[in-house]
A protein has these predicted regions:
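ATP-dependent carboxylate/acyl-activation modules
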Residues: 1-6, 11-322
Length: 322
């Protein structure tokens, strides 16, 4: 019901008439517009328990929220999948870091935790020296990726901490020396454990999967466009864990990048089921281990259906017990 004051308008009488109708089962939303001229009517509405909205738009928004809530009440029971995982292996890694007060879990150990929860990660090896990096590359097979291994370097690409498509021992040695020189100059106080040498994975779309633990809502799962674009596009969505397959799918569809991931101009779309399942696995991981306060897989290389999607980089932060 919308009312604007005219010469013969009686706001109080109108409000009492609306209040009388409120005894029926139909919801009534009222917007009396006119400031002090309609104040007697607004007071009558408040006294009768009817909300009076400042504008019709706010009334419609409230009605939409009521409809959404009714639909939520009618939804079928939630089924949260529990996957068979190696929880004991993940627990050993987490407890080791807690014992040594290393609350930032680096890529190598973070990927070991992901493996325990059945994520696919590329074969890789931590190398403390340039010679070890060359040896690791020879074992893994070229081409390889080299990434700085440091708990203090979060955004590796920003400081020259990632080198792609290295195809020879000479390229590995040169990349190692240049990486150490650049990071030493830009972050002289950073703790450097060496480099992480990893087999190059097939190309695909880059997305980010993650979680941040909110003090009130608990673990909040995150999905969005990944790689370097997550900082620029800021197209991410969140959902409280634990999560169902349908809820994970709704997360994907709620982003602006969903249309891009479906495929444009002849490009194949990505395997959305693989992303949804991976979000469920993160949900299970962070529910199993409340010690995890933050984590992300960025990028998660997602391929078209029929190909394997890969966790290309990962980090996990544990709760500081001090």
């Amino acid at each position: 019901v919308i009312l604007t004051p005219q010469a013969m308008t009686q706001p109080a009488e109108t409000a009492r008439g609306i209040a009388a109708c409120n005894r029926r089962s139909k919801p009534i939303l009222v917007s009396f517009m006119g400031g002090q001229n309609v104040m007697p009517g607004r007071e009558e509405l408040v006294a009768s328990g009817l909300p009076d909205y400042e504008s019709p738009e706010r009334a419609v928004a409230a009605l939409r929220a009521m409809c959404d809530y009714a639909a939520w009440l009618r939804r079928p029971p939630r089924v949260v999948t529990r996957f068979p995982v190696n929880r004991r292996r993940a627990d050993r890694i987490i407890q080791r870091h807690l014992k040594t007060r290393e609350y930032e879990i680096g890529e190598a150990s973070a990927k070991d935790i992901l493996r325990a929860y059945d994520f696919t990660v590329q074969p890789g090896q931590l190398a403390a020296t340039a010679a070890e990096a060359v040896e690791a590359a020879g074992k893994l097979g070229y081409p390889i990726v080299m990434k700085i291994a440091s708990p203090d370097v979060i955004h590796k690409s920003d400081v020259g901490g990632v080198k792609l498509n290295l195809n020879s021992p000479t390229a590995v040695l040169d990349a190692y020396d240049l990486m150490m020189m650049r990071i030493g100059a830009r972050m002289p106080d950073a703790r450097i454990h060496g480099v992480y040498v990893e087999k190059m994975c097939e190309s695909g779309r880059e997305v980010i999967l993650g979680m941040v633990r909110d003090p009130q809502f608990g673990p909040m799962l995150m999905f969005g466009l990944g790689g370097i674009f997550v900082e620029v596009m800021k197209d991410v969505t969140f959902h409280i864990a634990p999560i169902t397959q349908d809820e994970a799918r709704q997360m994907l569809e709620s982003t602006k990048s969903f249309a891009l991931l479906k495929g444009v101009r002849g490009q194949a779309g990505v395997d959305f089921d693989a992303i949804a399942t991976s979000l469920q696995r993160i949900s299970q991981l962070v529910t199993d281990f409340p010690e995890i306060v933050e984590m992300d897989i960025n990028p998660f290389i997602v391929a078209p259906p029929g190909r394997i999607s890969v966790a290309a980089d990962a980090r996990i932060t544990l709760k500081d017990s001090a």
